[in-house]
From Swiss-Prot:
Record-linked InterPro entries: 5-3_exonucl_a-hlix_arch_N, 5-3_exonuclease, 5-3_exonuclease_C_sf, DNA_polI_H3TH, FEN, HhH2, PIN-like_dom_sf, Xni
Segments of this protein annotated with the region Interaction with DNA: 185-190
Enzyme Commission number(s) of this protein: 3.1.-.-
Gene label: xni
Binding site for Mg(2+): D105
GO molecular function, one term: 5'-flap endonuclease activity
Name of the protein in question: Flap endonuclease Xni
Keyword Nuclease: yes
């Protein structure tokens, strides 16, 4: 079975950079990134590897909701300039890159989905818990910094909902890390309680008459924001990609 190792480029590099004693020591970031990717290849032994990078275009999520990811700390200018060199270093080692038009997330989700649809497997390297919605047979999430696969059961326990409810949970409670709003006045505990009782967002909205007046009002008034939040959190798994996987085969 072919296995594609998909590395979330900026997620990896920015965390490596943040851990450096001297943030201007870009050469060390470059070498640490290469070492990290080499270690992943040794650990997972994939047939193919690809590093996906965010592009410069405004994402469709930002167009849908202007506050999406608002307030994120911008990438240090020195690191931004060094990305080309980092990509070249990886390419020289046989680890090739793909740049998304905007966010890398949907491209990563599409690559993983296509691998499974073609009887392969995918390992996504990222600390972004948004990829948890993709976990199933032959799709795993690897945290390079903890050296662990995402334990979906532990993640379910943390949120107090099941995996199939993750997007409904975001629709209700939002996602503070990405500035996805959710419904005003509905926090993580209330969202989990509602989903444990009614199972789905649709069932919740079909049962407003069975809820307390204040909570029902919050849900009714926040219905459109719930719809937007769900869409913001949902990864697009069938983006049009014009690539040939052969160019990303690991050279033995």
């Amino acid at each position: 079975m072919n296995t594609l190792l998909i590395i979330d480029g900026l997620n990896l590099v920015r965390r490596i950079h943040a851990a450096q004693p001297d943030e201007n020591d870009i050469n060390n970031v470059q070498q640490m990134t290469l070492l990290a990717c080499t270690k992943m290849l040794k650990t997972h032994q994939p047939s193919h590897v690809i590093v996906v990078w965010d592009g410069d275009e405004e994402s469709w999520r930002k167009k849908l909701y202007s506050d999406y990811k608002k307030g994120r700390k911008p990438m240090p200018e020195a690191l931004k300039i060094a990305l080309v060199g980092i990509r070249n270093t990886l390419s020289e080692a046989g680890i090739h890159s793909l740049e998304a038009e905007s966010e890398a997330d949907d491209v990563i989700a599409t690559l993983a989905t296509k691998m499974v649809e073609n009887s392969g497997a995918a390992i996504i390297v990222s600390t972004d818990k948004g990829f948890s919605q993709l976990v199933k047979k032959n799709i795993q999430i690897w945290d390079h910094f903890k050296q662990l696969f995402l334990d979906i059961s532990a993640h379910e326990k943390k949120l107090a909902v099941e995996q199939y409810q993750f997007l409904d949970f975001i629709a209700l409670a939002g996602d503070s890390g990405n500035k996805i709003p959710g419904i005003a006045g509905i926090g993580p505990k209330s969202a989990a309680d509602l989903l444990n009782k009614f199972r789905t967002l649709a069932n919740i909205y079909n049962s407003l008459d069975n809820l307390g007046a204040k909570q029902a009002q919050k849900l009714a008034e926040g219905r459109e924001m719930a719809r937007i939040s769900y869409k913001l959190g949902q990864l697009q798994c069938h983006m049009p990609l014009e690539i040939n996987l052969k160019q990303f085969r690991v050279k033995k």
